[in-house]
A protein has these predicted regions:
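Bacterial N-terminal signal peptides that target proteins for export
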Residues: 1-9
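N-terminal signal peptide c-region/cleavage motif recognized by signal peptidases
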Residues: 18-20
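Ligand-binding face of N-terminal immunoglobulin V-set domains in extracellular IgSF glycoproteins
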Residues: 24-181
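Catalytic-core regions of glycoside hydrolase
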Residues: 199-473
Length: 582
């Protein structure tokens, strides 16, 4: 109690110091949660106040500070976060806090009628990055006159953090002058999230185009593997499993009917991510493992017999390593009716190699592929017909139709795409209400997909690419409009030293990637509650927010209310279970 009183007194004195002795001009500032996208001209709220957050151990939780000054531009603006101090002297070190500058992208075309042109926040430039721990040049910055500047503040709560109430301060400076001291409170629940996502993911990443964006051209395979490693690690830190990488399959020799595969370089690339050593004890999410990995095949496998032998070696190797349950064979992407016979033949050939090789196809359930498909991954639009709109999918297959496949130990994944906003068009009424990863949509749309995955009992989420805009000559930091959407297929931006400072190349995360991770963390709450009770208990919480695949509450306050109530319920039931155990 004395410690809490002392901290409160210190905070009060600091705030008095700011109000009496800060250099002019003083800022207008406010805080928001992570589900508000603040535009440059948004009107500041009338009340300045700090923020209160809630999180489990081994969870990231973010908020935003927005700065503005209408009288003049202000140079040398910086933000520093203190340690978070909690019960009985517990401390969450400020080294677990990352401060990001939110850069605006000027969008020239809307993604849909729900979108909009103008400046939207999305690229995040760290003050000190989590990958190389280098100070970057986004801070200090000049606060432009008459414009809002949002800052993303990300707190990681380490495993085994003592539950309870924590307090900290975010100090805003201009040069050496303190302009604001913003109180931050964090309540840590009595439970912990796992490091590895309970919902499987496979998000595409093309290391070849990433290298070209960072180096200007393809240089060599070592550089290709290196840039792929840092992006794959970045994805894992966001609870996402990347597939593709350098796109280099392990080499083989084929002599006298025998197939030999050299796994050395491949295992060095993927092994740490599959074994849980890519993120060590000193990293967030220690021991996190990727939940999926794709089979890479060779163009030089010129006969079916060679393909069968090569794929069989994949299964043997992955079985020996304990990785087999996460291996999938991406047979075909959105095949047409005319392509179905060929797709079925390729899938059957993979099963000829070994029936344990899981074949994935992005298609609704169809008799044309009956038999050799193990992972059905239809478009989210293909589960339900939206009333008043023409069917986007042919066919639309309801979720219950997949139940016989699940009883046969098959899996159902899904994905969202340009069908959420309109493919190469400004989408109309049909293209509203769906979960979406474009920039110019409400933040809840970027976060809600895992909630729907729980509601519909979906086993995994597929996404075609996280760096699609890297394939063009244009700088992704200036334009990520593709397939009719702003940011469609692009969740990262290239962090080049000549642009962001430092000595090393890193991926820059997007606000949307942060929100995807928030949704995956929400999913863990559903798992925890269902483990304490049953699945129906978690369903009731999800149903408060999600009605169907195209209808959910877009209001940030609704999501945060449900999440807080859900966390309190998990804590209450956990206490009750521990009490019965005693």
């Amino acid at each position: 109690m004395t410690s809490l009183h002392t901290r409160s007194l210190i905070l009060l004195l600091l705030m008095l110091l700011v109000s009496r002795g800060s250099a002019k001009p003083s800022f207008t500032w406010w805080t928001t949660n992570a589900l508000v996208k603040t535009m440059p001209s948004d009107v500041p709220p009338s009340i300045q106040q700090g923020i209160t957050l809630h999180a489990a151990s081994n969870e990231f939780e973010a908020f935003q500070i927005v700065l503005r000054n209408d009288s003049a531009a202000v140079p040398d603006v910086d933000v520093e976060m203190s340690d978070l101090t909690g019960p009985s002297g517990s401390v969450i070190s400020s080294s677990n806090v990352t401060v990001y500058f939110e850069r605006y992208l000027n969008l020239s075309r809307p993604s849909s009628i729900d979108g909009g042109v103008g400046e939207w926040p999305d690229p995040l430039i760290p003050r000190v990055d989590r990958y190389e721990h280098e100070r970057r040049n986004a801070f200090p910055f000049t606060l432009a006159k008459g414009r809002n500047q949002p800052l993303w503040i990300e707190i990681y709560v380490p495993p085994k953090t003592r539950p309870g109430h924590y307090q900290a301060q975010a100090t805003v400076l201009s040069g050496s002058a303190i302009q604001a001291v913003i109180p931050v409170s964090l309540d840590v629940w009595e439970f912990e999230l796992p490091s590895t996502s309970s919902l499987r993911t496979a998000f595409g990443f093309n290391g070849v185009i990433a290298l070209k964006q960072h180096a200007g051209r393809y240089t060599n395979d070592d550089d290709l593997r290196s840039i792929s490693q840092v992006y794959t690690r970045a994805a894992l830190l966001h609870r996402v499993s990347a597939f593709g990488g350098p796109l280099i399959p392990p080499p083989f020799t084929h002599k006298a009917g025998a197939m030999t595969v050299d796994w050395s370089l491949y295992d060095a690339e993927v092994g740490p991510f599959l074994n849980g050593t890519a993120l060590s004890k000193g990293d967030p999410l220690p021991g996190a493992r990727t939940t999926s990995v794709e089979l890479r095949t060779h163009g030089s496998l010129d006969t079916d017999k060679k393909k069968v032998l090569y794929w069989r070696e994949w299964v043997r190797h992955f079985d020996k390593k304990g990785w087999l349950s996460r291996l999938f064979n991406y047979v075909s992407d959105e095949p047409t009716a005319a392509q179905m016979p060929g797709v079925k033949k390729r899938a059957a050939l993979a099963h000829e190699a070994d029936h344990r090789l899981s074949n994935l196809v992005t298609s609704p359930l169809t008799r044309a592929l009956d038999g050799p498909i193990d992972i059905w991954s239809p478009l989210i639009n293909c589960f339900e017909t939206k009333p008043g709109s023409p069917d986007f999918c042919e066919p639309t297959v309801p979720r219950r139709a997949y139940d016989p496949e699940i009883r046969r130990h098959k899996s159902v994944w899904w994905y969202q795409s340009c069908a959420s906003h309109g493919c190469n068009i400004v989408g109309g009424e049909y293209f509203t209400g769906w979960p979406s990863y474009v920039i110019d949509t409400g933040a809840v749309s970027n976060r809600i997909m895992p909630w729907m995955s729980w509601k519909y009992r979906i086993d995994g989420e597929l996404y075609y690419n996280m760096v699609e805009a890297y394939s063009r000559e244009a700088d992704p930091l200036e334009d990520v409009f593709l397939h009719g959407g702003n940011g469609d297929g692009t969740l990262f931006y290239p962090g080049r030293p000549n642009a962001i400072g430092g000595a090393t190349h890193i991926p820059l995360e997007s606000v949307r990637l942060k929100l995807i991770r928030e949704g995956l963390e929400d999913y863990e709450y559903f798992v925890l509650l269902s483990n304490l009770t049953d699945s129906a208990s978690a369903d009731r919480w999800v149903d408060k927010l999600v009605h169907n695949t195209y209808t959910f509450s877009p209001l940030p306050e609704d999501l945060y209310r449900v999440r807080q109530e859900l966390g309190d319920e998990i804590q209450r039931r956990g206490r009750a279970m521990r009490g019965r155990g005693n």
